[in-house]
Amino acid sequence: MTAKRIDGKAFAAGVRARVAEEVARLKEGHGIVPGLAVVLVGEDPASQVYVGAKGKQTVEVGMTSFEHRLPAGTSEAELLALIDRLNHDPAVHGILVQLPLPAHLNADLVINALDPAKDVDGFHISNVGRLGTGQKSMVPCTPLGCLMMLRDHLGTLSGLNAVVVGRSNIVGKPMAQLLLGESCTVTVAHSRTRDLAAVCRGADILVAAVGRPEMITGDFVKPGATVIDVGINRIERDGKTKLVGDVDYASAAEVAGAITPVPGGVGPMTIACLLANTLTACCRANGLPEPQGLTA
């Protein structure tokens, strides 16, 4: 068996196209333009690349992009004052604070200063709690992207056994909550899980989000399972730097029914879902129906 390759790049392009259609409809029918504000503190090179990509794609789908690039020495009071202004700006429907923040800033305090309705990363404690109790919330972008691809590939997820390897607040925990919401039977595995391979082999859906290069091999995969690889790891191989996931693609693809590659799998979905969340936030703020299929 050779697994079907789930093309996240193509799927993300489809999501962005759908968002662009809905944005055009909002403009034409209601005179509303969704706005996304991205806040970057400091000059971390990777963060600068991410912020640039987010701004570019925001404009491409017809939204307004607001970029706030602050010096590394920005005080907590200055950052919180900016967030307060964005919270009260009617042109801004989504706010994203690029992480990590410089060490002198309290990330939890900053994230929880956001208006939960504009927290398009889904990290505010209110959104975390609402997701956990099955209420309408802003859903973290990467798990949302995984869910969209799973729904597209499998249709209904109800009754399937799902194993999420990783328990981070950004991916593992919200992914488990989303799968519970789809009526999966969910196991969250982690570094202390005994006989991890055996646990994973019980999964119809296996989500790897543990941050360890190629840890999940074909021996961990149930024949025919759907494998979602969230990992992004840079390793040295044959004198070159290579990007790999948490799954050993070659061996897992021999067993799985479908699998996401790295790169080109989950990664492109993250920004696409950020745009979808901004659209959703805009619709909610204006009392308009949310587009179907773009949120949990």
From Swiss-Prot:
Catalytic reaction(s) noted: (6R)-5,10-methylene-5,6,7,8-tetrahydrofolate + NADP(+) = (6R)-5,10-methenyltetrahydrofolate + NADPH; (6R)-5,10-methenyltetrahydrofolate + H2O = (6R)-10-formyltetrahydrofolate + H(+)
GO CC entries: cytosol
UniProt binding sites for NADP(+): G166, R167, S168, S191, I232
Alphabetized SUPFAM superfamilies for the sequence: Aminoacid dehydrogenase-like, N-terminal domain, NAD(P)-binding Rossmann-fold domains
Catalytic activity, EC: 1.5.1.5, 3.5.4.9
Top-rank lineage group of the source organism: Bacteria
Involved pathway(s): One-carbon metabolism; tetrahydrofolate interconversion
GO biological process terms on file: L-histidine biosynthetic process; methionine biosynthetic process; purine nucleotide biosynthetic process; tetrahydrofolate interconversion
Molecular functions (GO terms): methenyltetrahydrofolate cyclohydrolase activity; methylenetetrahydrofolate dehydrogenase (NADP+) activity
Keywords for this protein: Amino-acid biosynthesis, Histidine biosynthesis, Hydrolase, Methionine biosynthesis, Multifunctional enzyme, NADP, One-carbon metabolism, Oxidoreductase, Purine biosynthesis
NCBIfam families found in the cross-reference section: PRK10792.1, PRK14186.1, PRK14188.1
Role, per record: Catalyzes the oxidation of 5,10-methylenetetrahydrofolate to 5,10-methenyltetrahydrofolate and then the hydrolysis of 5,10-methenyltetrahydrofolate to 10-formyltetrahydrofolate.
Subunit structure, as described in the record: Homodimer.
Protein name: Bifunctional protein FolD
